[in-house]
Amino acid sequence: MTQSEKIINLTNHYGAHNYVPLPIVISEAEGVWVKDPEGNTYMDMLSAYSAVNQGHRHPRIIQALKDQADKVTLVSRAFHSDNLGQWHEKICKLAGKDKALPMNTGAEAVETALKAARRWAYDVKGIEPNKAEIIAFNGNFHGRTMAPVSLSSEAEYQRGYGPLLEGFRKVEFGDVNQLKAAINKNTAAILVEPIQGEAGINVPPEGYLKTIRELCDEHQILFIADEIQAGLGRSGKLFATDWDHVKPDVYILGKALGGGVFPISVVLADNEVLDVFTPGSHGSTFGGNPLASAVSIAAIDVIIDEDLPGRSLELGEYFKSELKKIEHPSIKEVRGRGLFIGIELHESARPYCEALKEQGLLCKETHDTVIRFAPPLVITKEELDMALEKIKSVFA
């Protein structure tokens, strides 16, 4: 029995079976490359669902981690830490917002944004108590905690978790008429992924986000953009909402904000929104801790200094155009923006992902029939060409 098989057996025996990973164990990683305990090398084309946009173990981010770990790692928000202020300033200026509220995971940040939206609805907009509604979209994925689960349109995500939370409406992604019909006097916010990741890399119709912006302005509604997966360069723009030249009222960021090294997420908005929080109304023991702040500062610097959005745009256009040249009866559509690309099939994508793994390329199916490609944004054209050869061989 190999070391990998032993590890997988231990995980299957002692771990809850809430994931069905590909049968591979990763023990080392650098850049776009990962290695298993037996020494086999693979190209990572998933980037931990876009958490590793800067590449595995980017030296600047790792150095920031080490330097901070030698000083202080956690003080809780009962006290100030010496780099949280710097982090606040950097992330607010990056997004063009007045204030930031740091959390740890994407789901936590979504919960935070929903709490802010509801309190804003009552304190600022004047909606009748306990009547606020939030509109989301079919196919959405905002996390695994109870509010995101209640928002979901996937029956399996909700099965056995009732009673679900109330106050949510769902409409078809990209359908303007349904969205307009769902708005009423109690609508507090519209929560949208600018590109739906888990649903299969669904890109909205051109101008759809602009329409959301206009409707929010017209009806005094908060436009909340969940950029956890599509943001920070993944789509070929710093923020995926930039494709429609709009700025949401609230950004939710995570994943790549920690450079694939340490979890950190954030809700960003102007004073009118985040000033609804008062001392004791929200918090997190680890949110904004010194280690996360140091890592995140370095992670942001890498995104900007190395122009990862620009790299994603240029290489993504090349990659997508080459994928579209592949002719195979199983391929229904190739879509995406930047290095955030899906190949939708007429059949299950899992066997193709398993075949690509045998070719030394790691990716994962999503929504059953879509192969998702989201490599680290530091990938080179030469490495992309290597990936293309492996993909073509699987579809030969």
From Swiss-Prot:
Domain of life: Bacteria
Pathway per the UniProt entry: Amino-acid biosynthesis; L-proline biosynthesis; L-glutamate 5-semialdehyde from L-ornithine: step 1/1
Residues modified to N6-(pyridoxal phosphate)lysine: K255
Any one Gene Ontology molecular-function term assigned to this protein's record: pyridoxal phosphate binding
InterPro entries assigned: Aminotrans_3 (IPR005814), Aminotrans_3_PPA_site (IPR049704), Class-III_PLP-dep_AT (IPR050103), Orn_aminotrans (IPR010164), Ornith_aminotrans_bact (IPR034757), PyrdxlP-dep_Trfase (IPR015424), PyrdxlP-dep_Trfase_major (IPR015421), PyrdxlP-dep_Trfase_small (IPR015422)
UniProt cofactor(s): pyridoxal 5'-phosphate
Reaction(s) catalysed (UniProt annotation): a 2-oxocarboxylate + L-ornithine = L-glutamate 5-semialdehyde + an L-alpha-amino acid
GO annotation (BP), single: L-proline biosynthetic process
Transmembrane segments: none
EC number(s) stated in the UniProt entry for this protein: 2.6.1.13
Key words, A-Z: Amino-acid biosynthesis, Aminotransferase, Cytoplasm, Proline biosynthesis, Pyridoxal phosphate, Transferase
Entry GO CC: cytoplasm
Pfam families given in the database record: Aminotran_3
Localization terms from the record: Cytoplasm
Matches recorded under HAMAP family: Ornith_aminotrans_3
Function: Catalyzes the interconversion of ornithine to glutamate semialdehyde.
Similarity comment: family membership: Belongs to the class-III pyridoxal-phosphate-dependent aminotransferase family. OAT subfamily.
Protein name per the record: Ornithine aminotransferase
